[in-house]
Amino acid sequence: MVRLSAVLMALLVWLTAMAAGDTMTGTPNDRVRSLRIVNPLDPYGPAVLRLGSGDVLAINFDVLSEDRDYLRYRLVHCRADWSPSTLVDSEFLDGFNEGEITDYRFSEATLVHYVNYNLTIPNADVAPLLSGNYLLQIYPESDPDDVWAQCRFMVCEEKVGISGNVMSRTDVDYNAGHQQLELRIDTRESGVADPFNDLFVVVQQNGRLDNEVALRQPLRMSGTTLIYEHQPQLLFEAGNEYRRMETVSTQFPPMGVESVEFINPYYYHILATDEPRAGSQYLYDETQKGRFVIHEYNSSDPDVQADYTVVVFSLDMPYDPGIMVFLDGDFTMRRFDENS
């Protein structure tokens, strides 16, 4: 089920499979829904804290239940490849690494009962001390090994200058099916002794994980500037814009919805049938690149007043048992598995 209020929930259909990593954002417990981690000042940006800046990340999620669950959280420091590091808590955290989630509210007048939970990082109990990759894990008080949900975030220090250029004139075609990225990284203030070999650069296309690129070395170095150009890893398929849909009401069909039906005990949003666009001309559409926002047409408090509905997707294409179709976006947590 998808929360009624998932407005501008952008969809991108992909025909390839991807295994889910153990440290990816996800909800192993099927009762946990609508997991989000955002900077409230930049809700469509990546989950990033600037060390010592006063930035805050807000974590919000629902648990399908009529009763409150006693939940706790912890932070895991990770290496560049998102594997857990060997640092002890006191080396990367100020405060206590395990805390109780006490901010919760019950859903109001919804067919599907749920409890909405909120948490902020940093808070009065804990704050990151080091830049790097972090994993926030949520688990029941009675069983710390049973992770119900986890989400990635990053803590950064602005020690390098980064400039980039995206071009449609690429090493393989011109204004056709690819885009090529060039990067320049000024390391003069970084304090890195050997930036040519010691910097690990990760590039994502609109937050996607399936084609994420990790660069170990630049093409060349000019003074203190690392130059990444004409590198095959930075050549991306251009693709199309994400598909958009809204499920903000059960009283009328919102954007992208063909009909709304009630089939006891749930409302169903039947989306308009879509089709593959790989062979179609590119059409610009202002989307949020797979992000979603919780909203409900008649509510001023959608976090607890928006209902969950069943959303029916359909893709008009010849059947091929060798092709798997996935929905990509933040609402599927960028995972290509049985839930997407």
Language-model features: locations:
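Basic K/R-rich, polyanion-interacting modules in nucleoproteins and related proteins
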Residues: 273-321
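Aromatic-rich carbohydrate-binding modules that target alpha-glucans
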Residues: 93-117, 209-218, 312-340
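Ligand-binding face of N-terminal immunoglobulin V-set domains in extracellular IgSF glycoproteins
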Residues: 111-141
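Contiguous beta-strand segments within globular domains
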Residues: 28-77, 174-187, 300-313
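Aromatic sugar-binding surface patches on proteins
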Residues: 100-103, 108-122, 222-244, 339-340
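Bacterial Sec-dependent N-terminal signal peptides
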Residues: 1-23
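Low-complexity, Pro/Ser/Thr- and charge-rich linker/hinge segments at domain boundaries
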Residues: 155-178
